[in-house]
């Protein structure tokens, strides 16, 4: 099976399509433009035909075409990711010792910081003030919606869809 997927651009008014990742013979996908329009962030793999290869987070500079891997030092898969509104950081989920916490990588320095720890986060987003909204579950606690401040503190549960069930049934 061929797992070589590429990123392409197509002019809105028609014209030639352009392959952006032809040199990588492994998987490239999940492209997201930066809010300032300067970059395209995407997930990539390096080993052709090896579907279990680690997913990395990479950037394409739209002006120069230069490609940069941001998560070279991160020893796990990069899952879902989102740009910060100022295009300086990318937040992403990545597995880490049995959890899936929220990380932040700086586009210039490539420094990775853990923002929300010890959580099996399945989805996340944030508002204009930088407050996070995410779902996570744990043993005995089905998926619920939580919020926290921009630095990952002041966590608060905001959905209680399974509260009655949790009180009636031991779901451990």
Spans of model-derived segments:
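A flexible loop/linker signature enriched in serine peptidases of the S9 family
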Residues: 1-6, 19-29, 43-58, 69-79, ...
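Hydrophobic beta-strand positions that form the internal "hydrophobic ladder"
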Residues: 37-40, 90, 131-133
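Loop/turn-rich, solvent-exposed surfaces of beta-rich toroidal or solenoidal domains
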Residues: 82-87, 92
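Residue-level detector of Asp-centered blade-edge/turn motifs that repeat once per structural unit
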Residues: 35-36, 85-86, 127-129
């Amino acid at each position: 099976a061929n797992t070589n997927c590429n990123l392409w651009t197509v002019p809105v008014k028609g014209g030639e399509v352009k392959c952006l990742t032809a040199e990588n013979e492994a998987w490239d996908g999940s492209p997201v433009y930066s809010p300032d329009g300067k970059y395209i962030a995407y997930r990539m793999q390096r080993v052709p035909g090896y579907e279990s290869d680690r997913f990395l987070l990479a950037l394409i500079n739209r002006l120069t075409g230069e490609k940069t891997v941001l998560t070279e030092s991160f020893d796990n898969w990069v899952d879902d990711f989102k740009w910060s509104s100022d295009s300086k950081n990318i937040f992403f989920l990545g597995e880490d010792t049995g959890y899936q916490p929220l990380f932040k990588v700086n586009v210039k320095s490539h420094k990775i910081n853990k923002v929300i720890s010890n959580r099996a986060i399945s989805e996340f987003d944030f508002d204009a003030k930088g407050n996070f909204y995410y779902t996570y579950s744990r043993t005995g606690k089905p998926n619920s919606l939580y919020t926290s401040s921009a630095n990952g503190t002041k966590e608060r549960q905001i959905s209680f869809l399974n509260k009655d069930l949790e009180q009636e049934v031991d779901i451990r």
